[in-house]
Amino acid sequence: MPEILKIKPTRMELLKLKRRVKLAERGHKLLKEKQDALIMEFFTIYDEALSLRRELIRKMEEAFNSLRRAQVDVGALRLKEIAIGVKPNKEIEIKTRNIMGVRVPLIEVPELKRKASERGYAFVSTTSTVDMAAEKFEEVLELAIRLAEVEESLKRLGKEIEKTKRRVNALEYIIIPRMENTIKFIEQHLDEMERENFFRLKRVKAILEARQSM
């Protein structure tokens, strides 16, 4: 006999257990639907992450090419001095949003691309190549922040998918089968009890009839 629950083999427990099986099956169905929806959402965001990563690599190549041109134009030392003088960019705000019950980051990014006059360095000390390099790296920063948001979302969704999968499997392969095995055991036990009672009553009836015929 497969593993069963440790409960009294009574009709009352049998009825309770049948109700529990129905609830477990309903829960399994809902969890499976949630798992499927999470997987679909995961791959949608995964495609976005791949696209962002490709775009980020392309933008980084452009940015470093621009940086090399600026370095040739004004020299490495002067470029470093200009970089030190750049004003910090605006702060980002990190919130969260809900995807199928999973809290994922939502990064609100202000406009990071700035005019040369907003960066804090003097016009006389720079050239168009320096401005171009700064602009390219601002684009890189925007993409990097967006990619960080998407990858963290993937990480959290992945954890929730694994968690949901474990619950689905536990219901499907352990909890529900164990309850069903217990139901079969109780039904067999009750059937056996009924048969025993039937034969006992039959014997009693036969004894009584025999006494009456004496």
Swiss-Prot record:
It is a peripheral membrane protein. Keywords: ATP synthesis, Cell membrane, Hydrogen ion transport, Ion transport, Membrane, Transport. The keyword Membrane applies. Its main location: membrane. GO terms for cellular component: plasma membrane. Pfam families: ATP-synt_D (PF01813). One of its GO terms (molecular function) is ATP binding. It comes from the Archaea. It is found in: Cell membrane. Disulfide bonds: none annotated. One of its GO terms (biological process) is proton motive force-driven plasma membrane ATP synthesis. The keyword Mitochondrion does not apply. InterPro entries: V_ATPase_D. Component of the A-type ATP synthase that produces ATP from ADP in the presence of a proton gradient across the membrane. Has multiple subunits with at least A(3), B(3), C, D, E, F, H, I and proteolipid K(x). Belongs to the V-ATPase D subunit family. This is A-type ATP synthase subunit D. It comes from Pyrococcus horikoshii (strain ATCC 700860 / DSM 12428 / JCM 9974 / NBRC 100139 / OT-3).
